[in-house]
A protein has these predicted regions:
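Hydrophobic alpha-helical bundle signature of multipass membrane enzymes
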Residues: 1-112, 121-149
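Membrane-embedded catalytic cores of phosphoryl/pyrophosphoryl-handling enzymes
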Residues: 101-204
């Protein structure tokens, strides 16, 4: 619903308003986004983190199953949302704000790549599974996806509805995999290897 409202009413107004963002703030948004891209593996591949999480899940599956399940859940959510966002870009073909303005006419199906936001999907698809597993840490976890979403809109690379759609997509994928994997809330990641716990049981 928020995405539809954004497309219908808010997108052009918000895009024109953020076009007045001070230069120093734009620099901060761009540099901050660049730093996050490096930290989260964008120079290697936009999908690198998802594959790393899945590989780590496979490595830990036998000896540290709780940790492996968390890695599998987060990795599957992240990779699926990231891939889905990329495919939807090709489906909707929306122009970016700097391409569509000032004569905004919806800007869909014109061979663009704005809707939904890949950057926003990248970070929201990490936030939602972690927030579902560790609700007590939701607020600090929220910092990165919010920063990236605001930054992408502020620098004119995305409309408001682009990042809202990415958040909604990531939430749906996270909840879907939570149901499939039957992930409990506040999952406890135990540091003790399975072999060690079995040994303790035998001694008892």
């Amino acid at each position: 619903m928020l995405t539809l409202l954004g497309i219908a009413f808010l997108d052009p107004s918000v895009a024109r308003w953020v076009a007045q963002t001070p230069a120093w703030m734009l620099v901060a948004f761009r540099q901050g986004t660049t730093v996050l891209e490096v930290v989260f593996g964008f120079p290697v591949s936009k999908f690198a983190l998802g594959f790393v999480l899945l590989i780590a899940a496979a490595v830990f599956m036998r000896r540290r199953r709780p940790l492996a399940l968390v890695l599998l859940y987060v990795g599957a959510t992240h990779l699926t949302a990231r891939l889905a966002a990329g495919m939807l870009k090709n489906v909707f073909g929306r122009e970016r704000p700097f391409e569509a303005l000032p004569d905004y006419e919806g800007a869909f199906f014109v061979d663009g790549s704005s809707f939904p936001s890949g950057h926003a999907a990248h970070f929201w698809s990490l936030f939602f599974p972690l927030a579902l597993l560790f609700p007590r840490y939701r607020l600090p976890l929220l910092v990165l996806p919010l920063f990236v979403s605001v930054a992408r809109v502020a620098v004119g690379d995305h409309f408001l509805s682009d990042v809202i759609a990415s958040a909604a997509l990531s939430a749906l994928v996270a909840w879907g995999f939570a149901y499939i994997f039957r992930m409990p809330r506040d999952e406890r990641i135990e540091a003790v290897p399975v072999a060690s716990k079995e040994a303790v049981t035998e001694e008892a």
